[in-house]
Swiss-Prot record:
Heterodimer of an alpha and a beta chain. It comes from Rickettsia felis (strain ATCC VR-1525 / URRWXCal2) (Rickettsia azadi). Its cofactor is thiamine diphosphate. The lineage of its organism: Bacteria, Pseudomonadati, Pseudomonadota, Alphaproteobacteria, Rickettsiales. GO terms for molecular function: pyruvate dehydrogenase (acetyl-transferring) activity. The pyruvate dehydrogenase complex catalyzes the overall conversion of pyruvate to acetyl-CoA and CO(2). It contains multiple copies of three enzymatic components: pyruvate dehydrogenase (E1), dihydrolipoamide acetyltransferase (E2) and lipoamide dehydrogenase (E3). This is Pyruvate dehydrogenase E1 component subunit beta. It catalyses: N(6)-[(R)-lipoyl]-L-lysyl-[protein] + pyruvate + H(+) = N(6)-[(R)-S(8)-acetyldihydrolipoyl]-L-lysyl-[protein] + CO2. Its EC number is 1.2.4.1. The keyword Chloroplast does not apply.
Length: 326
């Protein structure tokens, strides 16, 4: 059986709304229009306007409303049309949702999911293409999820909705329409468990979200040069499955990290720092990080392509750590 990422997310929200009447969805155009990307399709008809709520165009306003609802015991799912617009709600996410559990000594909970597309799409220019993975991962009190497959989107969304504290659920606009094979039943997937999608012995490639496809495609090409890549899909950035990464590096002795976001203070830099501390003696080459270029993402299609990680970038990085002529 195959379903799209869009359908996987919708199914997860639908199942949790049936299971728990405290769960509700809110955001711009999530009800009548059924979501800017049709992720909430059919939910208004099934659950009505009290649980599928169209909001004004004010991220600061409806994010604050949702955080208050979570403090009161409800379980809001907040859709941002894009995480670029969530900048308007940053204060509510970082200062209210993320910190209250700690500041209350564990007495107050904030069961809320902030979800929507993150990162580049296709020619939506600099202000609509930013990747916020590292930004939210930097904040104590936030769990950060960035899945690739339909099964993982659904399983991790089920877990996110049931979590008693805030989850940042980073989706990808391009992945919404991609279909994946899925089992008949998808159970909640625990946070902090990476997935080895391709076993190998020559080099470890660590990545997440849509860059997983880039890594898998590069690994297939590199196999022709007898370079056997192990590809790890992180699935969740925070908590990070450090153990799976370290064990893989101990086996392959080489590491390439692939992320769409910017290099400086990025996810890759944090992972590289951890591996250097925990597995330095196992490394046979410096760690390579493939990332987006340090520029606002251009609108021009040729420049946009050059600013984002490519399959050839991954291949070049892998050959470099394997001391292979390029």
């Amino acid at each position: 059986m195959q379903i799209t990422v869009r359908e996987a997310l919708r199914d997860a929200m639908q199942e949790e709304m049936i299971r728990d009447d405290k769960v509700f969805v809110m955001g711009e155009e999530v009800a009548e229009y059924q979501g800017a990307y049709k992720v909430t399709q059919g939910l208004l008809e099934q659950f009505g306007p009290k649980r599928v709520i169209d909001t004004p165009i004010t991220e600061y306003g409806f994010a604050g409303l949702a955080v208050g609802a979570a403090f009161a015991g409800l379980r809001p799912i907040v859709e941002f049309m894009t995480f670029n617009f969530a900048m308007q709600a940053f204060d509510h996410i970082v200062n209210s949702a993320a910190k209250t559990h700690y500041m209350s000594g564990g007495q107050a909970k904030c069961p809320i999911v902030f979800r929507g597309p993150n990162g580049a799409a296709s020619r939506v220019a600099a202000q609509h293409s930013q990747n916020y993975t590292a930004c939210y991962s930097h904040v104590p009190g936030l769990k950060v999820v960035a899945p690739y497959s339909a099964e993982d989107h659904k399983g991790l969304m089920l877990t996110a909705i049931r979590d008693d504290n805030p989850v940042i659920f980073l989706e990808n606009e391009i992945l919404y329409g991609h279909s994946f094979d899925v089992p008949e039943t998808i159970e909640p997937i625990p946070f902090g468990q990476a997935k080895i999608l391709r076993e190998g012995s020559s080099v470890t490639i660590v990545t997440f979200s849509i860059q997983v496809k880039l890594a898998l495609d590069a690994a297939n090409v590199l196999q022709n040069d007898n370079i056997d890549c192990e590809v790890i899909d992180l699935r969740t950035i925070k908590p990070l499955d450090t153990d799976t990464i370290i064990e893989s590096v101990k086996k392959t002795n080489r590491l390439v990290i692939v992320e769409e976001g910017w290099f400086f203070a990025g996810v890759g830099a944090s992972i590289a720092s951890i591996v250097m501390k925990e597995a330095f003696d196992y490394l046979d080459a410096p760690i390579e990080i493939v990332s987006g270029k340090d520029v606002p993402l251009p609108f021009a299609v040729n420049l946009e392509k050059l600013a984002l990680p490519s399959e050839s970038d991954v291949i070049e990085a892998v050959k470099k750590v394997c001391y292979y002529s390029v």
